[in-house]
Amino acid sequence: MVPPIIYKYKRRKDRRLGRDDDSSVMMTRRRPDSDFIEVSDENRSFALFKEDDEKNRDLGLVDDGSTNLVLQCHDDGCSLEKDNSNSLDDLFSGFVYKGVRRRKRDDFGSITTSNLVSPQIADDDDDSVSDSHIERQECSEFHVEVRRVSPYFQGSTVSQQSKEGCDSDSVCSKEGCSKVQAKVPRVSPYFQASTISQCDSDIVSSSQSGRNYRKGSSKRQVKVRRVSPYFQESTVSEQPNQAPKGLRNYFKVVKVSRYFHADGIQVNESQKEKSRNVRKTPIVSPVLSLSQKTDDVYLRKTPDNTWVPPRSPCNLLQEDHWHDPWRVLVICMLLNKTSGAQTRGVISDLFGLCTDAKTATEVKEEEIENLIKPLGLQKKRTKMIQRLSLEYLQESWTHVTQLHGVGKYAADAYAIFCNGNWDRVKPNDHMLNYYWDYLRIRYKL
Protein backbone atom coordinates (compact mmCIF):
# COMPACT_ATOMS: atom_id res chain seq x y z
CA MET A 1 0.00 0.00 0.00
CA VAL A 2 1.44 3.35 -0.99
CA PRO A 3 1.16 5.80 1.92
CA PRO A 4 -0.75 8.97 1.21
CA ILE A 5 0.98 12.32 1.09
CA ILE A 6 0.93 14.08 4.45
CA TYR A 7 0.59 17.86 4.45
CA LYS A 8 1.43 20.45 7.07
CA TYR A 9 -1.41 22.56 8.40
CA LYS A 10 -1.18 25.96 10.00
CA ARG A 11 -3.79 28.24 11.46
CA ARG A 12 -4.53 31.46 9.64
CA LYS A 13 -5.54 34.53 11.58
CA ASP A 14 -7.22 36.23 8.63
CA ARG A 15 -9.76 33.47 8.05
CA ARG A 16 -13.18 33.26 9.64
CA LEU A 17 -14.73 30.14 11.02
CA GLY A 18 -17.50 28.34 9.19
CA ARG A 19 -20.73 28.29 11.18
CA ASP A 20 -22.36 25.15 9.80
CA ASP A 21 -21.34 21.77 11.10
CA ASP A 22 -17.86 20.38 11.74
CA SER A 23 -17.45 19.38 8.13
CA SER A 24 -18.03 22.85 6.72
CA VAL A 25 -15.04 23.92 4.66
CA MET A 26 -14.20 27.15 2.89
CA MET A 27 -12.48 26.94 -0.46
CA THR A 28 -9.88 29.51 -1.53
CA ARG A 29 -8.91 30.54 -4.98
CA ARG A 30 -6.02 28.95 -6.76
CA ARG A 31 -2.99 31.12 -7.14
CA PRO A 32 -2.23 31.90 -10.77
CA ASP A 33 1.52 31.29 -10.36
CA SER A 34 1.26 28.00 -8.47
CA ASP A 35 -0.31 24.58 -9.02
CA PHE A 36 -1.22 24.24 -5.36
CA ILE A 37 -4.67 24.66 -3.83
CA GLU A 38 -5.10 26.00 -0.31
CA VAL A 39 -7.88 24.35 1.71
CA SER A 40 -9.06 25.15 5.24
CA ASP A 41 -11.84 23.91 7.52
CA GLU A 42 -13.70 25.44 10.45
CA ASN A 43 -10.87 24.56 12.80
CA ARG A 44 -8.78 26.99 10.73
CA SER A 45 -6.52 24.24 9.45
CA PHE A 46 -5.45 24.48 5.86
CA ALA A 47 -3.25 22.67 3.36
CA LEU A 48 -2.01 22.95 -0.20
CA PHE A 49 -2.88 20.30 -2.74
CA LYS A 50 -1.34 19.80 -6.11
CA GLU A 51 -3.47 18.41 -8.90
CA ASP A 52 -2.33 15.32 -10.72
CA ASP A 53 -3.93 12.43 -12.54
CA GLU A 54 -5.58 11.20 -9.39
CA LYS A 55 -8.25 13.73 -8.47
CA ASN A 56 -8.69 12.37 -4.97
CA ARG A 57 -6.18 13.09 -2.18
CA ASP A 58 -6.43 11.94 1.40
CA LEU A 59 -5.71 14.72 3.82
CA GLY A 60 -4.81 12.38 6.64
CA LEU A 61 -5.38 13.87 10.06
CA VAL A 62 -6.71 17.39 10.22
CA ASP A 63 -5.76 19.28 13.39
CA ASP A 64 -6.51 16.89 16.28
CA GLY A 65 -7.23 13.92 14.10
CA SER A 66 -10.98 13.83 14.66
CA THR A 67 -12.03 13.48 11.01
CA ASN A 68 -10.59 12.48 7.65
CA LEU A 69 -11.30 14.72 4.67
CA VAL A 70 -11.19 13.60 1.06
CA LEU A 71 -10.57 16.05 -1.75
CA GLN A 72 -13.00 15.56 -4.66
CA CYS A 73 -11.91 17.40 -7.82
CA HIS A 74 -14.17 17.66 -10.94
CA ASP A 75 -14.25 19.79 -14.02
CA ASP A 76 -16.22 22.53 -12.34
CA GLY A 77 -14.10 22.60 -9.14
CA CYS A 78 -12.82 20.74 -6.06
CA SER A 79 -14.50 20.20 -2.70
CA LEU A 80 -13.75 18.43 0.58
CA GLU A 81 -16.09 15.78 1.94
CA LYS A 82 -16.02 13.95 5.24
CA ASP A 83 -14.95 10.35 5.08
CA ASN A 84 -16.86 8.37 7.69
CA SER A 85 -15.13 5.09 6.96
CA ASN A 86 -13.47 3.63 9.98
CA SER A 87 -10.60 1.95 8.15
CA LEU A 88 -7.66 1.47 10.47
CA ASP A 89 -5.29 1.38 7.51
CA ASP A 90 -6.33 4.86 6.51
CA LEU A 91 -6.18 6.04 10.11
CA PHE A 92 -2.66 4.80 10.88
CA SER A 93 -1.31 5.70 7.48
CA GLY A 94 -1.07 9.29 8.67
CA PHE A 95 1.55 8.33 11.20
CA VAL A 96 3.94 6.79 8.71
CA TYR A 97 6.02 9.98 8.37
CA LYS A 98 6.28 11.75 11.66
CA GLY A 99 7.82 15.18 11.80
CA VAL A 100 8.79 17.65 14.47
CA ARG A 101 6.13 18.78 16.85
CA ARG A 102 5.55 22.52 16.57
CA ARG A 103 3.72 24.66 19.07
CA LYS A 104 1.77 27.76 18.04
CA ARG A 105 -0.60 30.12 19.76
CA ASP A 106 -4.04 30.98 18.37
CA ASP A 107 -6.07 34.16 18.75
CA PHE A 108 -7.29 33.14 22.19
CA GLY A 109 -3.82 32.47 23.60
CA SER A 110 -4.15 28.67 23.69
CA ILE A 111 -1.24 26.50 22.55
CA THR A 112 -1.91 24.13 19.68
CA THR A 113 0.41 21.58 18.13
CA SER A 114 0.92 20.33 14.61
CA ASN A 115 2.76 17.10 13.94
CA LEU A 116 2.63 16.95 10.15
CA VAL A 117 5.42 18.03 7.85
CA SER A 118 5.16 17.78 4.10
CA PRO A 119 8.40 17.14 2.20
CA GLN A 120 6.81 18.49 -0.98
CA ILE A 121 6.22 21.91 0.51
CA ALA A 122 9.98 22.28 1.08
CA ASP A 123 10.46 22.28 -2.68
CA ASP A 124 8.28 25.36 -3.18
CA ASP A 125 9.84 28.80 -3.70
CA ASP A 126 10.26 31.31 -0.87
CA ASP A 127 7.38 33.56 -2.01
CA SER A 128 4.75 30.84 -1.92
CA VAL A 129 5.92 29.70 1.48
CA SER A 130 5.74 33.19 3.02
CA ASP A 131 2.34 33.95 1.53
CA SER A 132 0.75 30.73 2.69
CA HIS A 133 2.38 30.94 6.16
CA ILE A 134 4.02 27.53 5.78
CA GLU A 135 6.98 26.95 8.07
CA ARG A 136 9.55 24.39 7.21
CA GLN A 137 11.84 22.69 9.68
CA GLU A 138 14.35 20.06 8.72
CA CYS A 139 15.76 17.93 11.51
CA SER A 140 18.88 17.13 9.60
CA GLU A 141 20.09 20.70 9.25
CA PHE A 142 23.40 21.53 10.88
CA HIS A 143 23.45 23.69 13.97
CA VAL A 144 26.85 25.30 14.50
CA GLU A 145 27.18 26.40 18.06
CA VAL A 146 29.39 29.31 19.07
CA ARG A 147 31.82 28.39 21.81
CA ARG A 148 31.72 30.59 24.87
CA VAL A 149 35.13 32.12 25.28
CA SER A 150 36.38 33.76 28.48
CA PRO A 151 37.66 37.35 28.15
CA TYR A 152 41.08 36.00 29.12
CA PHE A 153 41.11 33.87 25.95
CA GLN A 154 40.50 36.72 23.49
CA GLY A 155 44.06 36.60 22.26
CA SER A 156 43.94 32.91 21.47
CA THR A 157 42.44 31.71 18.25
CA VAL A 158 40.78 28.33 18.04
CA SER A 159 40.38 26.93 14.56
CA GLN A 160 37.07 25.20 14.09
CA GLN A 161 37.39 22.78 11.22
CA SER A 162 34.42 21.35 9.40
CA LYS A 163 35.74 17.80 9.34
CA GLU A 164 33.90 14.70 10.47
CA GLY A 165 33.52 14.70 14.22
CA CYS A 166 34.44 18.36 14.61
CA ASP A 167 31.28 20.17 13.49
CA SER A 168 28.26 20.47 15.70
CA ASP A 169 25.57 18.35 14.07
CA SER A 170 22.01 17.50 15.01
CA VAL A 171 20.62 14.16 13.93
CA CYS A 172 16.92 13.31 13.63
CA SER A 173 15.33 10.13 14.81
CA LYS A 174 11.90 8.98 15.87
CA GLU A 175 12.54 10.03 19.45
CA GLY A 176 13.60 13.54 18.49
CA CYS A 177 16.70 15.46 17.57
CA SER A 178 19.91 14.68 19.41
CA LYS A 179 23.10 16.69 19.08
CA VAL A 180 26.58 15.36 18.53
CA GLN A 181 28.72 18.25 19.56
CA ALA A 182 32.49 18.75 19.66
CA LYS A 183 33.68 20.51 22.77
CA VAL A 184 36.91 22.43 23.17
CA PRO A 185 38.66 22.08 26.56
CA ARG A 186 39.26 25.10 28.69
CA VAL A 187 42.69 26.59 28.20
CA SER A 188 44.60 28.65 30.76
CA PRO A 189 44.90 32.40 29.98
CA TYR A 190 48.68 32.06 30.06
CA PHE A 191 48.54 30.22 26.70
CA GLN A 192 47.18 33.22 24.75
CA ALA A 193 49.97 33.08 22.18
CA SER A 194 49.34 29.45 21.34
CA THR A 195 46.67 28.36 18.90
CA ILE A 196 44.80 25.21 19.82
CA SER A 197 42.88 23.26 17.23
CA GLN A 198 39.47 22.11 18.21
CA CYS A 199 39.95 18.62 16.78
CA ASP A 200 43.30 18.02 18.48
CA SER A 201 41.93 18.01 21.99
CA ASP A 202 38.19 17.50 22.12
CA ILE A 203 35.43 16.04 24.24
CA VAL A 204 32.89 14.15 22.16
CA SER A 205 29.53 13.77 23.86
CA SER A 206 26.47 11.99 22.51
CA SER A 207 23.06 11.58 24.14
CA GLN A 208 19.37 11.36 23.24
CA SER A 209 18.35 14.85 24.41
CA GLY A 210 19.90 18.28 24.00
CA ARG A 211 19.98 18.99 27.71
CA ASN A 212 21.66 15.74 28.71
CA TYR A 213 24.27 15.68 25.97
CA ARG A 214 27.09 15.64 28.50
CA LYS A 215 26.12 12.23 29.90
CA GLY A 216 28.15 9.32 28.66
CA SER A 217 30.81 11.53 27.11
CA SER A 218 34.24 10.17 26.38
CA LYS A 219 37.24 12.49 26.75
CA ARG A 220 40.23 12.47 24.48
CA GLN A 221 42.43 15.27 25.69
CA VAL A 222 46.14 16.01 25.22
CA LYS A 223 48.06 16.97 28.33
CA VAL A 224 49.31 20.54 28.39
CA ARG A 225 52.24 21.52 30.52
CA ARG A 226 51.70 24.40 32.91
CA VAL A 227 54.07 27.24 32.11
CA SER A 228 54.82 30.28 34.24
CA PRO A 229 53.26 33.59 33.04
CA TYR A 230 56.74 34.97 32.55
CA PHE A 231 57.21 32.53 29.65
CA GLN A 232 54.09 33.40 27.65
CA GLU A 233 55.95 33.46 24.34
CA SER A 234 57.31 29.96 24.71
CA THR A 235 54.88 27.07 24.52
CA VAL A 236 56.23 23.71 25.58
CA SER A 237 54.09 20.70 24.70
CA GLU A 238 54.47 17.87 27.15
CA GLN A 239 54.08 14.38 25.74
CA PRO A 240 52.44 11.84 28.04
CA ASN A 241 54.84 9.81 30.16
CA GLN A 242 57.73 11.98 28.95
CA ALA A 243 58.06 14.67 31.60
CA PRO A 244 61.31 16.65 31.30
CA LYS A 245 63.58 16.45 34.28
CA GLY A 246 64.22 19.57 36.30
CA LEU A 247 67.29 21.49 35.30
CA ARG A 248 68.03 22.35 38.90
CA ASN A 249 69.28 18.81 39.45
CA TYR A 250 72.06 19.37 36.94
CA PHE A 251 72.87 23.08 36.95
CA LYS A 252 73.24 25.65 39.64
CA VAL A 253 73.12 29.38 39.07
CA VAL A 254 76.02 31.21 40.67
CA LYS A 255 75.77 34.86 41.58
CA VAL A 256 78.31 36.88 39.62
CA SER A 257 79.58 40.37 40.31
CA ARG A 258 78.04 43.20 38.35
CA TYR A 259 81.41 43.94 36.82
CA PHE A 260 81.06 40.79 34.72
CA HIS A 261 78.83 41.64 31.78
CA ALA A 262 77.70 38.08 31.26
CA ASP A 263 74.18 37.38 32.47
CA GLY A 264 75.23 34.39 34.50
CA ILE A 265 77.59 31.47 34.72
CA GLN A 266 76.26 27.96 35.10
CA VAL A 267 78.57 25.57 36.88
CA ASN A 268 78.13 21.84 36.61
CA GLU A 269 77.96 20.40 40.10
CA SER A 270 79.63 17.17 39.04
CA GLN A 271 82.70 19.14 37.92
CA LYS A 272 82.55 21.69 40.68
CA GLU A 273 85.21 21.22 43.32
CA LYS A 274 84.44 21.87 46.91
CA SER A 275 85.68 25.29 47.81
CA ARG A 276 88.10 25.33 50.67
CA ASN A 277 87.79 28.01 53.27
CA VAL A 278 91.00 29.95 52.86
CA ARG A 279 91.98 31.67 56.05
CA LYS A 280 92.85 35.26 55.50
CA THR A 281 96.14 36.10 57.14
CA PRO A 282 96.21 39.53 58.73
CA ILE A 283 98.71 42.07 57.51
CA VAL A 284 101.66 41.87 59.85
CA SER A 285 104.18 44.65 60.13
CA PRO A 286 107.62 43.58 58.95
CA VAL A 287 109.71 42.34 61.80
CA LEU A 288 113.43 42.86 61.95
CA SER A 289 115.61 39.85 62.38
CA LEU A 290 118.16 39.59 65.18
CA SER A 291 121.02 40.49 62.90
CA GLN A 292 119.12 43.49 61.55
CA LYS A 293 118.31 44.73 65.03
CA THR A 294 121.99 44.80 65.89
CA ASP A 295 122.98 46.59 62.71
CA ASP A 296 125.05 49.78 62.97
CA VAL A 297 122.24 51.70 61.25
CA TYR A 298 120.11 51.51 64.45
CA LEU A 299 122.85 52.48 66.88
CA ARG A 300 122.18 54.97 69.63
CA LYS A 301 122.77 58.59 68.59
CA THR A 302 126.05 59.97 69.78
CA PRO A 303 126.48 63.53 71.04
CA ASP A 304 128.83 64.42 68.21
CA ASN A 305 126.23 63.62 65.53
CA THR A 306 125.30 66.90 63.80
CA TRP A 307 122.78 65.55 61.26
CA VAL A 308 119.88 67.94 60.48
CA PRO A 309 117.13 66.49 58.26
CA PRO A 310 115.95 68.92 55.58
CA ARG A 311 112.37 70.10 55.25
CA SER A 312 110.33 68.38 52.55
CA PRO A 313 107.04 69.01 50.81
CA CYS A 314 105.71 65.93 52.61
CA ASN A 315 105.49 67.91 55.90
CA LEU A 316 105.84 64.90 58.17
CA LEU A 317 105.37 65.18 61.94
CA GLN A 318 108.89 63.88 62.56
CA GLU A 319 110.39 66.87 60.70
CA ASP A 320 109.29 69.22 63.48
CA HIS A 321 110.61 67.10 66.38
CA TRP A 322 113.84 65.66 64.94
CA HIS A 323 115.96 67.34 67.71
CA ASP A 324 114.52 64.97 70.39
CA PRO A 325 114.78 61.25 69.48
CA TRP A 326 112.27 60.36 72.26
CA ARG A 327 109.57 62.47 70.54
CA VAL A 328 110.29 60.80 67.20
CA LEU A 329 109.74 57.37 68.77
CA VAL A 330 106.50 58.50 70.52
CA ILE A 331 105.12 59.95 67.26
CA CYS A 332 105.80 56.66 65.42
CA MET A 333 104.08 54.76 68.24
CA LEU A 334 100.93 56.92 67.96
CA LEU A 335 100.86 56.77 64.13
CA ASN A 336 100.38 52.98 64.14
CA LYS A 337 96.80 52.27 62.95
CA THR A 338 96.09 56.01 62.99
CA SER A 339 96.06 58.72 60.34
CA GLY A 340 98.43 61.66 60.43
CA ALA A 341 95.60 64.23 60.61
CA GLN A 342 94.21 62.70 63.81
CA THR A 343 97.63 62.44 65.42
CA ARG A 344 98.54 66.00 64.48
CA GLY A 345 95.69 67.40 66.60
CA VAL A 346 96.76 65.44 69.69
CA ILE A 347 100.55 65.52 69.51
CA SER A 348 100.93 69.21 70.41
CA ASP A 349 98.87 68.81 73.61
CA LEU A 350 100.72 65.64 74.57
CA PHE A 351 104.14 67.21 74.21
CA GLY A 352 102.85 70.21 76.11
CA LEU A 353 102.01 67.91 79.02
CA CYS A 354 105.03 65.64 78.63
CA THR A 355 107.89 67.76 77.37
CA ASP A 356 110.52 64.97 77.65
CA ALA A 357 110.95 61.34 78.70
CA LYS A 358 111.49 62.19 82.37
CA THR A 359 108.25 64.21 82.57
CA ALA A 360 106.28 61.41 80.87
CA THR A 361 107.22 59.03 83.66
CA GLU A 362 106.03 61.45 86.31
CA VAL A 363 102.62 62.31 84.75
CA LYS A 364 99.62 60.25 85.84
CA GLU A 365 98.24 57.74 83.39
CA GLU A 366 94.71 59.25 83.50
CA GLU A 367 95.96 62.56 82.18
CA ILE A 368 97.75 60.95 79.23
CA GLU A 369 94.71 58.75 78.54
CA ASN A 370 92.40 61.75 78.33
CA LEU A 371 94.68 63.40 75.77
CA ILE A 372 95.12 60.44 73.43
CA LYS A 373 91.56 59.11 73.89
CA PRO A 374 90.43 60.39 70.43
CA LEU A 375 93.04 58.11 68.81
CA GLY A 376 91.81 54.97 70.53
CA LEU A 377 93.68 52.35 72.55
CA GLN A 378 94.48 55.05 75.08
CA LYS A 379 95.22 52.72 78.03
CA LYS A 380 97.55 50.46 76.07
CA ARG A 381 99.36 53.35 74.48
CA THR A 382 99.74 55.17 77.79
CA LYS A 383 101.52 52.19 79.34
CA MET A 384 103.74 51.82 76.27
CA ILE A 385 104.73 55.49 76.38
CA GLN A 386 105.63 55.41 80.07
CA ARG A 387 107.61 52.15 79.72
CA LEU A 388 109.43 53.49 76.65
CA SER A 389 110.31 56.62 78.62
CA LEU A 390 111.76 54.59 81.52
CA GLU A 391 113.94 52.47 79.21
CA TYR A 392 114.98 55.50 77.16
CA LEU A 393 116.35 57.22 80.29
CA GLN A 394 118.60 54.27 81.04
CA GLU A 395 122.12 54.12 79.67
CA SER A 396 122.20 50.37 79.07
CA TRP A 397 120.67 50.21 75.61
CA THR A 398 122.95 50.48 72.54
CA HIS A 399 120.46 50.03 69.67
CA VAL A 400 117.09 51.68 69.35
CA THR A 401 115.54 48.32 68.51
CA GLN A 402 116.14 47.25 72.14
CA LEU A 403 113.53 49.69 73.46
CA HIS A 404 109.95 48.67 74.25
CA GLY A 405 107.42 49.21 71.42
CA VAL A 406 109.97 50.01 68.73
CA GLY A 407 109.47 48.16 65.42
CA LYS A 408 110.82 48.55 61.91
CA TYR A 409 108.79 51.71 61.26
CA ALA A 410 110.07 53.49 64.39
CA ALA A 411 113.63 52.18 63.88
CA ASP A 412 113.72 53.42 60.24
CA ALA A 413 112.39 56.84 61.34
CA TYR A 414 115.09 57.00 64.06
CA ALA A 415 117.82 56.17 61.51
CA ILE A 416 116.52 58.75 58.97
CA PHE A 417 115.71 61.74 61.23
CA CYS A 418 118.14 61.23 64.14
CA ASN A 419 121.25 59.40 62.93
CA GLY A 420 121.20 60.46 59.24
CA ASN A 421 121.58 56.85 58.00
CA TRP A 422 118.74 57.25 55.49
CA ASP A 423 120.87 55.89 52.59
CA ARG A 424 121.35 52.55 54.40
CA VAL A 425 117.73 51.72 55.09
CA LYS A 426 114.70 51.00 52.92
CA PRO A 427 111.49 51.89 54.77
CA ASN A 428 108.19 50.10 54.18
CA ASP A 429 105.89 52.90 55.31
CA HIS A 430 104.49 54.90 52.42
CA MET A 431 105.01 58.30 54.06
CA LEU A 432 108.59 57.49 54.98
CA ASN A 433 109.13 56.36 51.39
CA TYR A 434 108.04 59.80 50.14
CA TYR A 435 110.60 61.45 52.37
CA TRP A 436 113.26 58.88 51.50
CA ASP A 437 112.69 59.51 47.77
CA TYR A 438 112.94 63.22 48.42
CA LEU A 439 116.35 62.75 50.05
CA ARG A 440 117.58 60.61 47.18
CA ILE A 441 116.62 63.32 44.70
CA ARG A 442 118.10 66.04 46.85
CA TYR A 443 121.45 64.35 47.34
CA LYS A 444 121.43 62.74 43.88
CA LEU A 445 121.74 59.19 45.05
From Swiss-Prot:
GO terms for cellular component: nucleus. Keywords: DNA damage, DNA repair, Hydrolase, Nucleus. The active site is at D429. Transmembrane segments: none annotated. Its EC number is 3.2.2.-. One of its GO terms (molecular function) is DNA binding. It is found in: Nucleus. It is an enzyme of class 3 (hydrolase). Isoform 1 and isoform 4: Expressed in leaves and flowers, but not in roots or stems. The keyword Isomerase does not apply. The keyword Nucleus applies. InterPro entries: DNA_glycosylase, MeCP2/MBD4. Its main location: nucleus. GO terms for biological process: DNA repair. Gene3D superfamilies: Hypothetical protein, domain 2. The N-terminal domain (1-290) does not play any direct role in catalysis and is not required for product binding. This is Methyl-CpG-binding domain protein 4-like protein. It comes from Arabidopsis thaliana.
